[in-house]
Swiss-Prot record:
GO molecular function: carnosine N-methyltransferase activity; S-adenosylmethionine-dependent methyltransferase activity
Name this polypeptide is given: Carnosine N-methyltransferase
Family membership: Belongs to the carnosine N-methyltransferase family.
Binding locations of carnosine: 278, 309, 385
Keywords of the record: Methyltransferase, S-adenosyl-L-methionine, Transferase
Domain of life: Eukaryota
Effect seen on changing residue 317 to D: In strain: SK1
Function description: N-methyltransferase that mediates the formation of anserine (beta-alanyl-N(Pi)-methyl-L-histidine) from carnosine. Also methylates other L-histidine-containing di- and tripeptides such as Gly-Gly-His, Gly-His and homocarnosine (GABA-His).
Annotated source species: Saccharomyces cerevisiae (strain ATCC 204508 / S288c)
The keyword S-adenosyl-L-methionine is annotated on this UniProt entry: yes
Length: 400
């Protein structure tokens, strides 16, 4: 089996596992969040049941909401299966982590594609859009790593920008494919994005709020505007440097990716990182990659918290360098922790300006932004994250 065949088989197995997790959502959610609450309700005394007379109705509504969410995920899976087929050996059953990611997609779809979450999207857009309008050329090439289910791509391409998204998660990629390409009409789908969160509610009915998505028709909204595409894979692997980065779980030595990285050099006018830079186990790889992919004089716009995804992860990986002439591994580090390098915003700005030849144009801190937060007027849900916003400009004479 050659390198490409191996990569394709591995990718097919990963995609199959995600599609099956979509198909199993209803079964999983009924088991994990509904059946257990029914059992708890059955266990209490009749006297206590009389104290909460509406709880039986609540449980029935919770079950109905799970079933509706299941319809959404089945639609996503069925759409994906129109263009993907699998060999029997590629069918892999999802694990609990896969199912948890599937459940969390409801929050992501609500955040990106509902009218109710426009205030969350505007935390970035109200800052980014006016700045982009000052740039030349007006048809800038924009890269959005960690593009999620694709809403920011749509919004910016509608303004005339040529947008390329990058996404590592197959969960996100399959949902984005559906939201962008399935010809969905405005408010065609109803989801119940809050049913996996049982805390902080003022009224129990709010947890069962139905949300209509999408609030725009993405498939028709960018006609005659800028281009839009999505590249699947690790940001560092697809766009990073070919030298000076160690091989790891997110960076490979394959010939195909080497060519991709060479092509990416100095190719973008703007990189927009939105709730992204805290997602990697080595943020310096991200910073190097941003510097590599931007054209001289290019702009890096960042928005989001620094809630490092791996700060409490005790997992390990092997990292190493590869001799470009012999192909042998060198400087091998076994059991490299995934945690570590949780840099502050001051650290990041300092590295960018002092080592990567960026100039700081604008900076804000302490911006409160929700993340899939229920938007009701009396919401007691967690308020969200304290976010950082900055704009950095690469040196116009900089050569990667």
């Amino acid at each position: 089996m050659d390198e490409n065949e191996f990569d394709n088989q591995r990718e097919n197995k990963a995609v199959a596992r995600v599609i099956i997790s979509f198909l199993k959502y209803e079964e999983y959610a009924l088991k994990e969040i509904y059946n257990l609450r029914v059992k708890k309700w059955a266990s209490i005394s009749d006297r206590q049941k009389d104290m909460v007379p509406n709880y039986t109705k609540y449980l029935a509504n919770l079950k109905a909401a799970i079933i509706e969410n299941g319809k959404f995920f089945r639609s996503v899976a069925e759409y994906a299966l129109q263009s993907i087929s699998f060999e029997p050996g590629e069918i892999v059953q999802p694990n609990d982590l896969d199912m948890s990611k599937t459940c969390s997609l409801l929050t992501q779809v609500y955040r990106e594609w509902s009218a109710e979450a426009i205030s969350e999207r505007n935390c970035l857009n109200s800052r980014l859009v006016p700045f982009l309008k000052t740039l030349s050329p007006p048809k800038a090439d924009i890269l959005i790593p960690g593009c999620g289910t694709g809403r920011l791509l749509v919004d910016l391409s509608r303004m005339g920008y040529n947008c390329e998204g990058n996404e590592f998660s197959y969960h996100m990629l399959l949902v984005s494919q559906y939201m962008l390409n399935a010809g969905l009409l405005q408010n065609q789908i109803i989801i119940y994005p809050f049913i996996h969160c049982f805390s902080h509610w003022k009224k129990i009915e709010d947890q069962l709020s139905p949300i209509k998505v999408p609030d725009i028709e993405a498939w028709s909204s960018n006609k005659g505007m800028g281009s839009m595409s999505i590249c699947a894979g690790s940001f560092v692997d697809c766009y990073g440097r070919n030298q000076g980065t160690k091989i790891s779980s997110h960076y490979t030595f394959s010939r195909r990716m080497q060519l991709s990285r060479a092509k990416a050099e100095n190719s973008k006018d703007v990189v927009v990182t939105n709730f992204f830079i805290d997602t990697g186990s080595n943020i310096l790889d991200y910073l190097d990659t941003i510097g590599h992919v931007l054209k001289p004089g290019g702009i890096w716009c960042n928005f989001g918290p620094l809630l490092y995804h791996f700060e409490n992860d005790h997992g390990v990986e092997t990292t190493y360098e590869v001799n470009p002439y012999s192909g042998f591994q060198d400087k091998i580090n076994d059991y490299t922790p995934l945690m570590g390098l949780e840099l502050s915003s001051d650290d990041i700005i300092s590295i960018a300006t002092n080592h990567l030849d960026f100039e700081l144009i604008r900076r804000e801190s302490g911006i409160l932004c929700g993340y899939g937060r229920y938007a009701g007027p009396e919401s007691c849900a967690m308020p969200g994250y304290m976010c950082h916003y900055w704009i950095l400009k690469s040196n116009p004479t900089n050569e990667s």
